[in-house]
Amino acid sequence: MARCCFYTAGTLSLLLLVTSVTLLVARVFQKAVDQTIEKNMVLQNGTKVFDSWEKPPLPVYIQFYFFNVTNPEEILQGEIPLLEEVGPYTYRELRNKANVQFGENGTTISAVTNKAYIFERNQSVGDPTVDLIRTINIPLLTVVEMAQQPFLREIIEAMLKAYQQTLFVTHTVHELLWGYKDEVLSLVHIFRPDVSPNFGLFYERNGTNDGEYVFLTGEDNYLNFTKIVEWNGKTSLDWWTTDTCNMINGTDGDSFHPLISKDETLYIFPSDFCRSVYITFSSFENVEGLPAFRYKVPAEILANSSENAGFCIPEGNCMDAGVLNVSICKNGAPIIMSFPHFYQADEKFVSAIKGMRPNKEEHESFVDINPLTGIILRGAKRFQINTYVKKLDDFVETGNIRTMVFPVMYLNESVLIDKETASQLKSVINTTLIVTNIPYIIMALGVFFGLIFTWLACRGQGSTDEGTADERAPLIRT
């Protein structure tokens, strides 16, 4: 009986250890899990993946921070602007896909993303319909830019004198965000119907969408899950000066493909930034008990480099690191984009304004992604809207102002997975962990039987050494 147990334990130990090593080397269970995820992460009507894509379950909040001008007269005399940050004014962002249509072969799907904003008073510093902000007059600067066209110059100069426009204006937060009717723009609209008589930083963005997208469903390849192939009927942009800079790359930032490696670069096309950007791995994170890869927008995105030369408008007119001239896609308004407080920008932009305090924790854009599923667990998209301003002798409204990039406001669009969704995702991940760890369980059993085999071997050896009483007796007795 003991001999039988001895050989059984040894055989089982050897078989289990060989099997576990074979399974680990061949990655049998890992491949099975990966293939299951790849198969399920496809946009198909009636699936949970499709429902979550069409109506994202995670709450999204957008916080607006304005820079209130405290020394307007001194600025016009050539002094450094002193700005005071006012905010946040927080809105709940409701988003859903609409006009959804599948392509004939099931590999593409078209949709628009409707967004609506609901004010959250308990998360805000005040009432946007009451609170006043003094800021730079962007409509005025826009009209001044139009005056570079000879046939409009005299008309615009006359209008500015007649309406006594000033470089700094005061409006409510609500007006600055969602729009107000501007006197000068209303007059320009008569000559240029394409110019709206209304101005707002997010005018016509509440309850609307930014155009139709065509996405890949992931049917042909999981790496193509929700990747954009067309926006507003175009497969590429036409604002920039090189084909590379005009490319529409990646997803819209709401989702990513599963099975992400920290060595890969992910691409996003945020239409409000007027260009594609990429994000790179930064660190390992844990969100509500779930593992995550943190990806961030690197400083190279807005670097003054040869790779970004195609974003210089006019061609060759490149600004210093940390800012992007997007006037070409903002109806001619002299809008300059940057990260909040000129984070990661050239020091000259920071020192030109009193009140800029850039820091990583509050001003960096990032996204925490579960690498197994590609699901976003936490994220923050942060960027700042500025305007370019300089003294113009023909326009007294500009006074003796310094040439500078002038901050107007910045936003923080954030998302965080809720506990219920995190719990559901955690159960899925735990199940996959059990499956992928089966080889290790088999190996542990092999080690266990190996220990039994060793114990039996040692016990048997001890019994042999000790022997019976007769065996221990001397051969010759006297």
Curated annotation (Swiss-Prot):
It is a multi-pass membrane protein. GO terms for cellular component: endocytic vesicle membrane; lysosomal lumen; lysosomal membrane; plasma membrane. It comes from the Eukaryota. The keyword Nucleotidyltransferase does not apply. Keywords: Disulfide bond, Glycoprotein, Lipoprotein, Lysosome, Membrane, Palmitate, Receptor, Transmembrane, Transmembrane helix. Its main location: membrane. It is found in: Lysosome membrane. GO terms for biological process: aminophospholipid transport; endosome to plasma membrane protein transport; positive regulation of neuron projection development; protein targeting to lysosome; receptor-mediated endocytosis; regulation of carbohydrate catabolic process; sensory perception of sound. Pfam families: CD36. The chain crosses the membrane at residues 5-27, 434-459. One of its GO terms (molecular function) is scavenger receptor activity. Residues 155-191 are annotated as: Important for interaction with GBA1. Residues 2-4, 460-478 are cytoplasmic. Glycans are attached at residues 45, 68, 105, 122, 206, 224, 249, 304, 325, 412, 430. Residues 28-433 are lumenal. Interacts with GBA1. Belongs to the CD36 family. This is Lysosome membrane protein 2. It comes from Rattus norvegicus (Rat). The lineage of its organism: Eukaryota, Metazoa, Chordata, Craniata, Vertebrata.
